Design a protein with these regions (language model features):
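Hydrophobic packing positions in regular secondary-structure scaffolds
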Residues: 1-291
């Protein structure tokens, strides 16, 4: 993928979200050096720390030694810790998870997006990762194990198994009611599209959330959905998935099992960005829901 495609991807995201790029700054008055050759430490209170954005907390942690990082995170809930680890460097992730009791580490992994949890576990030795997987709830464990089967540089390696779907034969009203009451849909933090599946979980089409909420309630979804969406298979290289996201101005692309057409997950635009953009560029992009 050529360098100008990276820039197009960044521009596409900013245009789609209609957001201006902002730089998040941590005031230096909240950070102090203990001694000449000591690491940085925070003066900000624990209460204030937990109210900060996960990405900002992660930026702070990356500049602290692992011992201080672990101490700062003691008062975090499992969900807060998971959100922060998703934004942290692999080194911080490994240090924090290693410092937790295995049962709590598994609870934190359950709160993370499956693709993020899979990336974290892939960096651990087999014995440690297997121990944590065995402690996770069955459904979460299955999702993560599925992702770990795919090469790290493939679409399957960066996809998430959390996406909003409805039966293809639904009306608009039935689809909206399903999304309001379905627990899996409530867990989807990246609901820009709704995927229409048949009883065999094969993809029949896709409809944007905007089109869904503005369509007449009594009409069949078949009158509104795109029955020929852009898709990738789990072994499609990450860079190709990112190129498709940029080319077609997509917020996500479905990952399909090529032989059965069963829908496995989605590659979201933020994961596509993480794949191809240099770190310095990523930090200038707006934050996404679930990112």
């Amino acid at each position: 993928m050529k360098r100008y495609d990276y820039l197009n991807l960044a521009k596409s995201v900013a245009r789609l979200l209609k957001k201006r790029w902002k730089t998040h700054v941590i005031p230096w008055e909240d950070v102090a050096s203990i001694e000449h050759d000591d690491p940085l430490r925070l003066k900000v209170s624990q209460d204030r720390l937990v109210q900060m954005e996960p990405a900002d907390i992660a930026s702070i942690l990356d500049d602290l030694d692992h011992h201080t990082s672990k101490a700062l995170l003691q008062g975090f809930t499992d969900e807060q810790l998971a959100d922060t680890l998703e934004e942290s460097s692999p080194e911080v992730q490994q240090a924090v998870i290693a410092a937790l009791q295995p049962e709590r580490a598994a609870d934190v992994l359950e709160e993370m997006d499956p693709d993020e949890a899979a990336d974290l576990l892939a960096d651990m030795d087999d014995q440690a990762s297997e121990q944590l997987l065995n402690l996770m709830e069955d459904e979460d464990e299955e999702d993560v194990r599925t992702l770990l089967r795919y090469p790290e540089d493939s679409s399957g390696g960066i996809m998430t198994t959390e996406f909003a779907s409805v039966p293809a034969e639904f009306t608009v009203e039935q689809a909206l009611q399903h999304l309001r009451t379905n627990e899996d849909a409530k867990d989807d933090e990246f609901m820009y599209y709704v995927y229409l599946l048949d009883k065999n979980e094969t993809l029949q089409g896709v409809i944007s959330l905007r089109d869904l909420v503005t369509a007449p309630l009594h009409q069949e979804l078949s009158n509104w959905f795109d029955d020929d969406p852009v898709v990738v298979n789990p072994l499609t290289p990450q860079e190709e998935a990112a190129y498709l996201v940029a080319k077609y101005n997509l917020m996500a692309v479905p990952v399909i099992e090529p032989e059965s057409n069963v829908m496995l997950g989605i590659v979201t635009v933020d994961d596509a960005i993480d794949t191809v953009l240099p770190t310095a560029w990523k930090k200038k992009l707006p934050r996404f829901a679930g990112r």
